[in-house]
Amino acid sequence: MQIVLQVSIPQLKKMAAYYAPYAVSKAPKGAVFVAKLSQATVTAYKSGKVLFQGSGFKVEAARWQDNANQPTQKMNASHVTPGATIPTDFANWSVIGSDEVGAGAYFGPLTTAAVFVSKNDLDWVKALGIADSKTLTDAKMRDIAPEIIQRLPHHVVNLLPEKYNALQPHNNVNQLKAISHNFALHKVLEKIAPITPDAILIDQFAQATTYFNYLSKAQQSPVIRQNVYFTTKGEQYHLSVAAASILARVVELDTMVALSHEAGMTLPIGAGKAVDLVAAKLIRQGQDLNHFAKLHFANTAKAKSLVN
């Protein structure tokens, strides 16, 4: 089962950064990268064609389909449709939404936030102008985040590099995401008890069965599974996910400022060449990358090669 998308070169660069944690060292001729996830393999070519294969190909392709031309090839006539499982009128429900940032960035944390937006707060949240949180500037998010924090029940899991690096050898990136989402959701449920939300919406990064398998494997307790929905582009289906996305992003930005201050230099976001150069500089200065970066990224080896 597979699908091929045609994307622009700028979009291809974004995808390369996003999949950097999953990249393998060997790629076929003409390929920019090959990323192996638990349920899918993504192969991107210099031509802008990106091949998604495996049982989770739909979920992975859905992340990028809005910014791609029509698929050039599809198997089993499967169409990737974000939100296909979301009930009618879901946007008007009382929902806890969760989202994460930082998984594709070498420096900085993996940050996950969950926010409860009740029916009574929907109009207030709409007035903040966060419906399409992905288009907001960092400055605008910084303005909005304090209002969300003050009014809406929320919880943020900010997995700093040292903790991330301690956990990562025993948990793949998606498993760390699942653990963080589940913990954040549990904390918000505790805060709003005895109120129960109509639903929980997780911005999807894995198939539902895979997500719950991750939590079982990690022996998480309790596992939040009642009325849980998954979809990519979750912010388009409920404002709670948009609010969570903003909180996660602002906490990530604040953490990057703090880490940059400790490093004595600006730590770039992403996983490109600029990141390699800064990591190499940190090594030359005798600073510990474990404190600043996700060490399993290919950037670590690249930085060391620049030093040697």
Curated annotation (Swiss-Prot):
Enzyme Commission identifier(s): 3.1.26.4
Keyword Metal-binding: yes
Subcellular location: Cytoplasm
Reactions accelerated catalytically: Endonucleolytic cleavage to 5'-phosphomonoester
Keyword terms: Cytoplasm, Endonuclease, Hydrolase, Magnesium, Metal-binding, Nuclease
Origin: domain of life: Bacteria
GO molecular function, one term: magnesium ion binding
Pfam families: DUF3378, RNase_HII
Sequence ranges assigned to domain RNase H type-2 in this UniProt record: 93-308
TM stretches of this protein: none
Record InterPro entries: RNase_HII/HIII (IPR001352), RNase_HII/HIII_dom (IPR024567), RNase_HIII (IPR004641), RNase_HIII_N (IPR024568), RNaseH-like_sf (IPR012337), RNaseH_sf (IPR036397), TBP_dom_sf (IPR012295)
Cofactor dependence: Mn(2+); Mg(2+)
Top enzyme category: hydrolase
NCBIfam families xref list: rnhC (TIGR00716)
Its job: Endonuclease that specifically degrades the RNA of RNA-DNA hybrids.
UniProt-recorded name of the protein: Ribonuclease HIII
Lineage of origin: Bacteria, Bacillati, Bacillota, Bacilli, Lactobacillales
Gene name of this polypeptide: rnhC
